[in-house]
């Protein structure tokens, strides 16, 4: 299996890349700047928005860890999903894209999105809203085999790989036994690679919780 990883040297993408290589997958890593995360990766220095459909013809899966960053135009997060559609429509390739906790409902009543709550950080609100708009675009598509993987409210960069995670498929946040909505970067990366290997959760928005 060959996968294209967008943002292959970032916080999430480097973890996805490492785990994919450990599974014996080939990795084509797209990076905007910086260095390769591993000498075994076929590196392409290019922005997501400059990728062409033709250069992905040898890839079975695209895993995107793209994020605009906090200081860029939040609308880039919406536009990223439109780019995913352009790159993957009618290819049969499995698109697995990072979403955002803000695009999930707060609970099973499905009345309020997380980004709409007072607790949601102001600097993330427009980013989260645009991610949700992008996911809405995918949900209207019948030409793309997609999965959107949303972190929990606390996306923990330091918790490490526990290997024990829960997946939610109902569109709302999950909470552990301590009442926390938390996932580590490593566990979410593991979930993405598992989904790629198993070709699972097609056309679903899911969330991942570290148990």
Over which residues does each language-model region extend?
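A conserved pocket-lining segment of Rossmann-fold NAD(P)-dependent short-chain dehydrogenase/reductase
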Residues: 166-183
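N-terminal Rossmann NAD(P)H-binding glycine-rich loop of SDR-like oxidoreductase domains
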Residues: 3-23
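NAD(P)H-binding glycine-rich loop region in Rossmannoid oxidoreductase-like domains
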Residues: 35-91
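Substrate-positioning beta->alpha
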Residues: 130, 179-193, 204
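Short, polar loop motifs at secondary-structure junctions
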Residues: 29-36, 153
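Glycine/proline-rich active-site loop of Rossmann-fold NAD(P)-dependent oxidoreductases
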Residues: 141-142, 156-164, 195-204
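Glycine-/Pro-rich loop/turn segments that contact NAD(P) or position catalytic residues
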Residues: 72-160
């Amino acid at each position: 299996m060959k996968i294209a990883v967008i943002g292959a040297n970032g916080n999430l993408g480097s973890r996805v890349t490492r785990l994919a290589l450990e599974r014996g997958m080939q990795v084509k890593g797209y990076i905007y700047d910086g260095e390769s995360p591993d000498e075994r990766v076929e590196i392409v220095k290019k922005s997501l928005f400059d990728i062409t459909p033709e250069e992905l013809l040898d890839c079975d899966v695209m895993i995107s860890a793209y994020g605009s960053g906090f200081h860029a135009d939040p609308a880039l997060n919406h536009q990223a999903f439109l780019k995913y559609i352009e790159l993957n429509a009618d290819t049969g390739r499995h698109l697995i894209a990072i979403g955002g906790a803000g695009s999930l409902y707060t609970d099973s009543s499905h009345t309020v999105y997380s980004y709409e709550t007072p607790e949601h950080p102001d600097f993330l609100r427009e980013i989260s809203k645009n991610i949700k708009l992008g996911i809405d675009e995918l949900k209207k598509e019948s030409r793309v085999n997609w999965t959107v993987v949303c972190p929990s409210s606390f996306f923990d960069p330091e918790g490490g790989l526990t290997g024990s995670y829960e997946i939610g498929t109902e569109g709302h946040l999950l909470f552990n036994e301590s009442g926390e909505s938390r996932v580590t970067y490593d566990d979410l990366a593991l979930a993405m690679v598992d989904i790629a290997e198993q070709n699972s959760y097609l056309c679903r928005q899911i969330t991942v919780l570290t148990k």
